[in-house]
Amino acid sequence: MAKKLEITLTRSVIGRPEDQRITVKTLGLRKMHQTVVHNDNPAIRGMINKVAHLVKVKEIEE
Protein backbone atom coordinates (compact mmCIF):
# COMPACT_ATOMS: atom_id res chain seq x y z
CA MET A 1 0.00 0.00 0.00
CA ALA A 2 1.16 3.50 -0.79
CA LYS A 3 1.83 5.94 2.00
CA LYS A 4 -0.09 9.16 2.20
CA LEU A 5 0.67 12.36 4.05
CA GLU A 6 -1.89 14.31 6.06
CA ILE A 7 -0.80 17.96 5.99
CA THR A 8 -2.37 20.59 8.29
CA LEU A 9 -1.71 24.33 8.14
CA THR A 10 -0.94 25.32 11.75
CA ARG A 11 0.48 28.83 11.31
CA SER A 12 -0.67 31.77 9.22
CA VAL A 13 0.98 32.86 5.98
CA ILE A 14 0.47 36.54 6.85
CA GLY A 15 3.84 38.27 6.75
CA ARG A 16 5.56 35.32 5.09
CA PRO A 17 7.59 35.59 1.87
CA GLU A 18 5.70 35.18 -1.40
CA ASP A 19 7.40 31.86 -2.25
CA GLN A 20 6.15 30.33 1.01
CA ARG A 21 2.61 31.62 0.37
CA ILE A 22 2.64 30.08 -3.10
CA THR A 23 3.93 26.75 -1.74
CA VAL A 24 1.14 26.59 0.87
CA LYS A 25 -1.44 27.40 -1.81
CA THR A 26 0.03 24.74 -4.13
CA LEU A 27 -0.35 22.16 -1.36
CA GLY A 28 -4.07 23.00 -1.39
CA LEU A 29 -4.16 24.77 1.97
CA ARG A 30 -6.18 27.98 2.26
CA LYS A 31 -7.34 28.30 5.87
CA MET A 32 -5.77 27.75 9.26
CA HIS A 33 -6.19 24.19 10.58
CA GLN A 34 -7.31 22.95 7.16
CA THR A 35 -6.07 19.43 6.42
CA VAL A 36 -5.31 17.88 3.03
CA VAL A 37 -4.10 14.40 2.07
CA HIS A 38 -1.40 13.91 -0.58
CA ASN A 39 0.52 10.92 -1.87
CA ASP A 40 4.03 10.65 -0.45
CA ASN A 41 6.45 11.60 -3.22
CA PRO A 42 9.62 13.71 -3.51
CA ALA A 43 7.80 16.76 -4.92
CA ILE A 44 5.37 16.93 -1.99
CA ARG A 45 8.20 16.26 0.50
CA GLY A 46 10.15 19.17 -0.99
CA MET A 47 7.19 21.52 -0.60
CA ILE A 48 6.69 20.36 3.00
CA ASN A 49 10.37 20.99 3.79
CA LYS A 50 10.06 24.52 2.42
CA VAL A 51 7.17 25.39 4.76
CA ALA A 52 7.86 22.93 7.60
CA HIS A 53 7.55 25.73 10.18
CA LEU A 54 3.97 26.43 9.03
CA VAL A 55 2.54 22.91 8.73
CA LYS A 56 2.12 19.70 10.69
CA VAL A 57 2.60 16.42 8.82
CA LYS A 58 1.33 12.97 9.73
CA GLU A 59 2.00 9.78 7.76
CA ILE A 60 -0.99 7.54 7.18
CA GLU A 61 -1.25 4.10 5.59
CA GLU A 62 -3.94 3.48 3.00
From Swiss-Prot:
SUPFAM superfamilies: Ribosomal protein L30p/L7e. GO terms for molecular function: structural constituent of ribosome. InterPro entries: Ribo_uL30_ferredoxin-like_sf (IPR036919), Ribosomal_uL30_bac-type (IPR005996), Ribosomal_uL30_CS (IPR018038), Ribosomal_uL30_ferredoxin-like (IPR016082). Keywords: Ribonucleoprotein, Ribosomal protein. The keyword Glycosyltransferase does not apply. The keyword Endoplasmic reticulum does not apply. It comes from the Bacteria. GO terms for cellular component: cytosolic large ribosomal subunit. One of its GO terms (biological process) is translation. Pfam families: Ribosomal_L30. NCBIfam families: rpmD_bact (TIGR01308). PANTHER family: LARGE RIBOSOMAL SUBUNIT PROTEIN UL30M, MITOCHONDRIAL RIBOSOMAL PROTEIN L30. Part of the 50S ribosomal subunit. Belongs to the universal ribosomal protein uL30 family. This is Large ribosomal subunit protein uL30. It comes from Geobacillus sp. (strain WCH70).
